[in-house]
Amino acid sequence: MLGYICKYAPVEVFQSMGTQMERIEPDVTNFNQAEIRMHPNICSFAKGVLEEVMKKDYEGVILTTCCDSIRRLYDVLKEGFPEKFIYMLDTPRITKEAGIALYEQRIRTMIWEYEKFSGKTFDEKKFLEYIKDKDQEQQYARKQGALNIGILGARANDSMKEILEENKANVAFDLTCTGLGRKILVDEKEILAGYTRGLLSQFPCMRMEQAANRDELIRRFAGSVDGIIYHTVQFCDNYAYEYAWLKGWLDRPMLLLETDYTRQSSGQIRTRIEAFLESLAPEIHRGKPTGKGDKTMYVMGIDSGSTSTNAVIMDQDRKIRAFSVVRTGAKSGVSAQKALEEVLEKAGLAREDISWIVSTGYGRVSISFADENVTEISCHGKGAHYFNPKIRTILDIGGQDSKAIHLNEKGEVKDFVMNDKCAAGTGRFLEMIARTLEVSLDELGAIALTSTEKIEITSMCSVFAESEVISLIANNKEKADIADGVCHAIANKAFGLLRRVGMEPDFMMTGGVAKNPGVVRAVEEKIGSSLYICEEPEIVGAAGAALYALEKVL
C-alpha cells in the first residue's frame, strides 16, 4: 500500500498496476516523533503525516512539491525509510500545455522508478480501461432548507464536517486541497497526457500560477452559501494571507479556523464552528412554547468556565431572580451541580420549578441536567445586550481565553475572534503573576492603580513574562509598577483582538478579569473609550444562556 497526500498525485496510475492507495489524513494526539526529527515550525500537517507513516506499514509514500514543509518531510522519510518507495513528484505551478507536458514526463519518470522498485509493470492500455471504469467522486451541492456552509483554505480533516453535520448544516462546497472529487479526463489518443491534463485542471491550490483564476472560482462558489469556514494549518504559509484578502471583498460571513491537526484542539474547533453557525441563524434556538399557564415560569442559564461556574435563574419577565458563582474544580460536572443547588437555594425554588436549562462555556456538553447547550460567544452577545442594549463590542477575558465579539443592534453576533491557544492575558495568567508578586488576585489590580513608574512587559508568553517579572523584582522594582506593566501588557493583547472585529462603541468588558481595576483602566486607555461593566461581570454568559432558555419556552 502506498500513501499519498495531494490531489495532484497520479493515484489511478498506481491503482491500475494493482497497488492499493490511501490518502494520508493524520489523526494524532501528539507529535512525539516529529519533534525529534523535524524543526518546531514545520507545518502541523507535515508533522501529522510523519506520525501516521511511523504508525502504519506503508510500502511507500508519494509526496508533491507543494511547500517547503513537505520537502522537509520528504528528507526525513527518505532518510528514515531507505527501504521504502519515498518519492517526491515535482508538480509544476503552470497548468497550461507546457505544464501538462512537463508533468506527464515527470509522472513517466516516477512510473519507471516504481517499476524498478516493485517489479510491477505499467500498461497504458490497462490504465485506459481502468480510468474508463472509474466512477467520478460525488460532488457537494446546496441543500434547500438547510444552513449551507462552504469550506476554503488548507486541507481539513473530517472532524470539521462531522461538527457541521451534527449541527444540521450542509457542506455546499469544499474547496480545500482534497475537498473536491478527483477530475479524470479520458483521452484514448493521448492516454497519459489527457489524464495529466485532468489532474492539472482541478480547482487550483495556492501554489499554482495566478492565471489559474482561483479568485474567480471562489467568487462563483461563494454565492451559493450562507457562510464560509476558512481553514488554515498551524505554521502553514500558503493560505493565511488569502483569508485576509478574501475578507476584504467577499460578501459572505467568514470564520477563520486554524488547527494543529491533533485531537487536542477538538473542543476549541467545536466552539468556534457552533458559534459561527449560531451567528448565521440566530433563530435556530427558538422553540415552541412550553408554558405552564398562569404560573410564574423560571429558566436557568449555566456557564461552565475553566475558573468559575456561573448560574442564573430568570423569570418569564426577564428578571434575574438569583445567581451563583462557584469555583470550577477538577470536575466540571460537580461544579455545575454545586452551582445549580446554590442558585436554587438562593431563589427559593426546586429543580422541578425550572422549565428549561441552557448550558454554555467550555464545559457545556458535560452538564447532564441541561436541556440544550449554546456557545459562550452567542450567550455573551445576548447577555451583553440584555444588560446594555447600546453595546456593540465586547471584550471577554476569562480564566483560560480571551474573546472579542462584535454585535449588531439586536445583540446578534456579527463577528468574533478568540485567543484560546495561549494562557497569556487571561485570568490564569494574572493568578500566576499575583503569586509571583506575593499579593492576592484582588490586590493586584488595586495596587496597579498606585503605580508611579511606567514599566513595559515586553513578553506576552506567560512563561517568559513570569521570568521577566522575576527579573524586575530582582532589580528592586515596586510591586505596583510591575502590576501596572502587566495590566498594560494584557490591554495591548486585548486591543489586538478588538481591532480584528472592528472597534464600534459602546464597549463592554465581561469575565472575571473585568473585576480587575488595573486591567480595566489599561484597556480604557488603549481604546480611548470607557468600558461598561455590569455589577457581576462573570454572569453575563449565564444570563445570555437564560435568555436563550426563555426563547424556548415563551
Q: What would you call each of these model-derived segments?
A:
Residues 293-317, 392-411:
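Gly/Thr-rich phosphate-binding beta-strand-loop-beta motif of the actin/hexokinase/Hsp70
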Residues 301-334, 338, 413-416, 420-421:
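Short glycine-rich, Thr/Ser-proximal phosphate-binding strand/loop in the N-terminal lobe
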Residues 331-332, 409-453, 547:
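Glycine-rich phosphate-binding loop plus the immediately following alpha-helix
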Residues 465-498, 538:
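Adenine-nucleotide phosphate-binding core of ATP-dependent small-molecule kinases
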Residues 1-298, 317, 422-429:
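An N-terminal assembly and electron-transfer interface module characteristic of large anaerobic redox
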Residues 362, 499, 503-526, 538-541:
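Glycine-rich phosphate-binding loops at beta-strand->alpha-helix junctions
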Residues 252-260, 376-377, 524-543:
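Conserved phosphate-binding/catalytic loops in two-lobed NTP-binding clefts
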Residues 430, 534-554:
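Glycine-rich phosphate-binding/hydrolytic loop that grips phosphoryl groups
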